[in-house]
């Protein structure tokens, strides 16, 4: 266990040298800022009961656009950096001299991806609170942060199949980024077409699956959500864990 923790620390040091952790944190503000401005328009405010309800709407939009669209791209790019850095620096021979198995090295990299996913989701939630507190009524932070953590874990787990493709079939960072963008657009398109696509396809894609689950979870926690059109599409937490666990 100590060796694994040391490996995780080493992987973070690699990202720190590239200043990517700071970029991930700044990226968390990419969607909350414009969405918060959008929420202040009269056309948007009249759709909500009060400012607390509008804050729920802002959080839901950040969850859908900021996290579930942007996070797979970030995870894919970070994975490419972590798995390609030994190749780029020609340090494979150095790793082979260390008494560590390939499984330990790969596990450490995957743990870093999950931590990055959770950190990004928490940062996005904090950004939503910071930009929303000036015009909306902020409340329910404990639940929203917990939901963001769950979403980060689920989205990262669902992105692991993409990482396999990136690592084994991609040879350049540009192709990796394009592949991640395509993957995110594919998932978001499927989510938008939920009323036209079979349930099986929607549940096999991590973003629609997580979107439907999070919508149902927010509804159960008293957040005003119109889920009439999603009837029959909302999975249980056990089903989400089972499906994403198989994917991962």
Where are these regions (language model features)?
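Helix-capping/transition residues at the boundaries of transmembrane alpha-helices
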Residues: 14, 84, 95-97, 166-170
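Aromatic- and glycine-rich beta-strand/loop motifs that create alpha-glucan
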Residues: 1-29
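Aromatic-anchored segments of alpha-helical transmembrane domains
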Residues: 30-36, 125, 182-192, 209-210
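Terminal transmembrane helical anchor/hairpin motif
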Residues: 41-58, 177, 185-248
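Helix-loop-helix units of permease transmembrane domains in multi-pass membrane transporters
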Residues: 81-114
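Secretory targeting signals
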Residues: 27-77, 107-173, 229-237
């Amino acid at each position: 266990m100590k060796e694994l923790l040391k490996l995780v620390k080493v992987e973070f040091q690699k990202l720190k040298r590239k200043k990517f952790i700071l970029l991930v944190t700044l990226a968390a503000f990419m969607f909350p800022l414009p969405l918060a401005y959008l929420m202040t328009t009269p056309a948007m405010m009249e759709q909500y009961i009060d400012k607390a309800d509008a804050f729920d709407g802002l959080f839901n939009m950040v969850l859908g656009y900021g996290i579930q669209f942007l996070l797979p791209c970030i995870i894919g790019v970070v994975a490419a950096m972590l798995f390609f850095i030994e190749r780029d620096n020609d340090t494979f021979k150095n790793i082979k001299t260390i008494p560590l198995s390939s499984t330990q090295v790969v596990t450490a990299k995957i743990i870093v991806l999950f931590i990055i996913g959770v950190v990004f989701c928490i940062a996005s939630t904090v950004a939503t609170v910071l930009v929303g507190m000036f015009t909306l009524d902020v409340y329910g932070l404990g639940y929203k942060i917990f939901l963001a953590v769950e979403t980060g874990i689920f989205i990262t787990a669902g992105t692991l199949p993409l990482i396999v493709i990136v690592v084994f079939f991609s040879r350049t960072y540009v192709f990796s980024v394009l592949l991640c963008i395509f993957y995110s657009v594919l998932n978001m398109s499927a989510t938008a077409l939920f009323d036209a696509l079979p349930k099986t396809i929607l549940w096999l894609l991590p973003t629609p699956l997580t979107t439907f689950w999070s919508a149902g979870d927010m509804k159960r926690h008293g957040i005003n959500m119109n889920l009439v059109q999603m009837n029959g599409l909302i999975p249980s937490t056990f089903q989400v864990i089972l499906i994403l666990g198989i994917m991962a």
